[in-house]
Design a protein with these regions (language model features):
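Absolute protein N-terminus
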Residues: 1, 20-21
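Compositionally biased, low-complexity segments enriched in small residues
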Residues: 1-2, 154
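Sec-dependent signal peptide recognition
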Residues: 2-11
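Hydrophobic h-region of N-terminal signal peptides that target proteins for export
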Residues: 10-19
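Non-catalytic cap/lid and distal C-terminal segments of serine-dependent acyl enzymes
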Residues: 21-284
C-alpha cells in the first residue's frame, strides 16, 4: 500500500513537473553599450512543443544593487508564474528580466536611463526589445507588451511607460524610485556611479513628467493601465503617493495599493502575484 502511494506521488510529481515553465539565461550583444548584456527569460509550459505559438511579453526590471538573476532567485519567478498560469490568474506569457546593474555599485553601471557612457534606454528599445521578441515569439505590439519592476526598476518601468506609452498596455510599479533630490555629491577619488544613477533618476523624474505633461501627452498616458504598489513603511512611500495624486489631478486613471510592508522581498513576493494578473487582464 505504501509503495503504491509513493508511486502515485511520484507520478503526480512528474505530471506537475512536465507542465512547468522554465527560466533560461540568455544574452544579447549590444552595440549601443559595447558589451554583452545578460537576461533571464521565463517561457511557459508548451513553449517548445508549439513552435508557432505567440505570447504576450512582460519586461520585469530589477532594483538597485541587484542584477538579472534577482527575480529568478529571490523572486522565485518560475514558481510564481507557473502557479498563476495554472490557476488561470495569469495568461501564458514570456517574462524578460534584463540586467541593468549589480552589487558593486560604485564601479558597475546601474540604471535604466541614458547617462554619459551608459545609454541603457537606447539599448533597451533599439536592441533588447526587438531581438528578444523575435527570438521568443513574444510581444510585437502595445497590446501584447507590459513593463513592471521594483525600486529602481519600478521607476524605470514607470518612465518607460510614460515616454513610450505607444509600446506598453500596462505598467506595474512596485516601491518605485521615482525621483531623487539631486543633492547627492560625487564621491571624490573614485568612479562614483552611484552619483550618476542618482542624478539620472532626478533628471528623468516620473513626477516631473506628469507635472509638465501637455494635453497630448496626457492623452497618451491615459492609453496605459497604471498600478502603483508601495508599502506603508517604505522610505519611498511619499513619492509613490505623490505620483498617484499627480495623475489623479490630470485625470489619468491609476490603481494605488498601500499595504503593510517595507522595501524588501517580503513585500515584492506579494506584489508580483498581483502584478502578473494585472498585466494579463490588460493585454489585448
Amino acid at each position: 500500500m505504501i509503495k503504491k502511494m509513493f508511486s502515485l506521488a511520484a507520478a503526480l510529481w512528474v505530471c506537475v513537473a512536465a507542465q512547468a515553465g522554465r527560466v533560461l539565461t540568455d544574452s544579447v550583444r549590444s552595440e549601443v553599450l559595447g558589451e554583452w548584456v545578460k537576461y533571464c527569460v521565463y517561457v511557459p509550459d508548451g513553449f517548445d512543443r508549439n513552435a508557432t505559438a505567440h505570447y504576450p511579453v512582460v519586461y520585469l526590471l530589477h532594483g538597485f544593487t541587484d542584477d538579472y538573476r534577482a527575480w529568478r532567485d529571490k523572486g522565485q519567478m518560475q514558481t510564481v508564474a507557473d502557479e498563476l498560469i495554472e490557476t488561470g490568474e495569469a495568461v501564458p506569457m514570456v517574462i524578460v528580466m534584463p540586467n541593468a546593474g549589480g552589487p558593486r555599485t560604485y564601479e558597475t553601471w546601474n540604471g535604466y536611463f541614458n547617462m554619459p557612457g551608459w545609454r541603457y534606454e537606447d539599448f533597451f528599445f533599439q536592441e533588447l526589445v526587438p531581438q528578444v521578441e523575435q527570438k521568443y515569439r513574444a510581444g510585437g505590439s502595445k497590446g501584447q507588451r507590459a513593463v513592471m519592476g521594483l525600486s529602481m526598476g519600478g521607476g524605470g518601468s514607470t518612465v518607460y511607460g510614460q515616454r513610450h506609452a505607444d509600446l506598453f498596455s500596462s505598467v506595474y510599479a512596485m516601491s518605485a524610485w521615482l525621483d531623487s533630490d539631486g543633492g547627492r555629491r560625487r564621491q571624490e577619488g573614485v568612479d562614483d556611479k552611484v552619483f550618476l544613477v542618482t542624478q539620472a533618476v532626478h533628471q528623468h523624474s516620473a513626477l516631473d513628467y506628469v507635472r509638465k505633461a501637455d494635453d497630448e501627452t496626457v492623452k497618451q498616458l491615459r492609453s496605459v493601465k497604471w498600478f502603483i504598489d508601495c508599502g506603508d513603511d517604505d522610505f519611498l512611500f511619499d513619492l509613490n503617493v505623490e505620483l498617484h495624486q499627480l495623475m489623479r489631478k490630470k485625470r489619468i486613471k491609476s490603481e494605488l495599493r498601500i499595504r503593510n510592508g517595507q522595501h524588501n522581498w517580503e513585500y515584492w513576493h506579494q506584489a508580483i502575484r498581483m502584478a502578473l494578473p494585472f498585466a494579463s487582464r490588460n493585454f489585448f
